[in-house]
Design a protein with these regions (language model features):
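Hydrolases whose catalytic domains are alpha/beta-hydrolase-1, hotdog thioesterase
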Residues: 98-102, 122
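The feature captures the conserved acid-bearing segment of alpha/beta-hydrolase catalytic domains
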Residues: 120-139
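Gly/Ala-rich beta-loop-alpha elbow adjacent to hydrolase catalytic centers
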Residues: 91-95, 99
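Serine-hydrolase catalytic machinery in alpha/beta-hydrolase-like enzymes
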Residues: 1-87
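Short, structured coil segments at secondary-structure junctions
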Residues: 41, 106-107, 135
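Active-site nucleophile loop of the alpha/beta-hydrolase fold
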Residues: 50-51, 113-121
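Conserved hydrolase catalytic core segment
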Residues: 101-110
């Protein structure tokens, strides 16, 4: 069972799931500011941590992110626990990348990526994952 950090109204029409980036936890300053702003707009915000960050919180040791299969499964588990109906998924940097990789399989309609590198610096031809639904990018 995933431990969530919730912000916003419990009876919101939509919930947005936010995953942290590679180096900072779900309650980092950046994530707190974003969650607060989204909650003030009427969204319910659900933050969670990938397994490697849970371990870091338990023992204080920094470690690299889990391999992609673990991150993907973890995000899909979060979606299953909350239910994909009326769910927006996303995250900061690595968390956004993982969200973009599970969006189709998760059955969610909206994806939000914050601080997400859609392509390596100076290489726009190497764009991010193949997102098959209408999308817009705001830099």
């Amino acid at each position: 069972m995933t431990e969530f950090l919730f912000d916003g109204p419990k009876n919101a029409d939509r919930t947005i799931v936010l995953a942290h980036g590679a180096g900072a936890p779900m309650d980092s300053d950046f994530m707190n500011v974003i969650a607060s702003g989204l909650a003030k707009s009427g969204l319910r915000v659900a933050r969670f941590e990938f397994p490697y960050m849970v371990k870091r919180r338990e023992d204080g040791r920094r470690r690299p992110p889990d391999r992609a299969p673990v991150l993907l499964e973890s995000y899909l588990q979060v979606v299953a626990e909350l239910g994909p109906e009326n769910l927006i998924i996303g995250g900061k940097s690595m968390g956004g990348r993982i969200a973009s990789m599970v969006a189709g399989a998760a059955g969610v309609a909206v994806l939000v990526c914050l601080g997400y590198p859609f392509h390596p610096p100076g290489k726009p031809e190497n764009s991010g994952p193949n997102i098959s639904r209408p999308s817009g990018r705001r830099h």
